[in-house]
Amino acid sequence: MANKKIRIRLKAYEHRTLDTAAEKIVETATRTGAKVAGPVPLPTERSLYTIIRATHKYKDSREQFEMRTHKRLVDIINPTQKTVDALMKLDLPSGVNVEIKL
């Protein structure tokens, strides 16, 4: 797999679990002999939901809920077969969405 690049994009609602997953990926890739660029923090998506507190009236009384999606990007440059096997066996925390592009 010479001159190839694996791009890993991570998404999670909690930034601490996202950072631990990124650290595990970087540590695994460097241990197996590949170069790593990242983790690069990408912009956080912020979804805001406004809901009326009362069921029938009192429209002036509202409550707002926010949901943030944190993202990180990790590039693995010139991965070996050993790197790919180690990444496939890697156990990441739940709640982290992983997208891999070759």
UniProtKB/Swiss-Prot annotation:
Recorded source organism is: Streptococcus pyogenes serotype M12 (strain MGAS2096)
Recorded hits in Gene3D superfamilies, A to Z, give:
Ribosomal protein S10 domain
InterPro entries listed in its UniProt record: Ribosomal_uS10, Ribosomal_uS10_CS, Ribosomal_uS10_dom, Ribosomal_uS10_dom_sf
Q: What are the alphabetically sorted keywords of the record?
A: Ribonucleoprotein, Ribosomal protein
The molecular function GO annotations come to: structural constituent of ribosome; tRNA binding
Q: How does it assemble?
A: Part of the 30S ribosomal subunit.
Its lineage reads:
Bacteria, Bacillati, Bacillota, Bacilli, Lactobacillales
Its recorded name reads Small ribosomal subunit protein uS10
Stated family: Belongs to the universal ribosomal protein uS10 family.
Its job: Involved in the binding of tRNA to the ribosomes.
Cellular component GO terms, alphabetically? ribonucleoprotein complex; ribosome
Example of a GO biological process term: translation
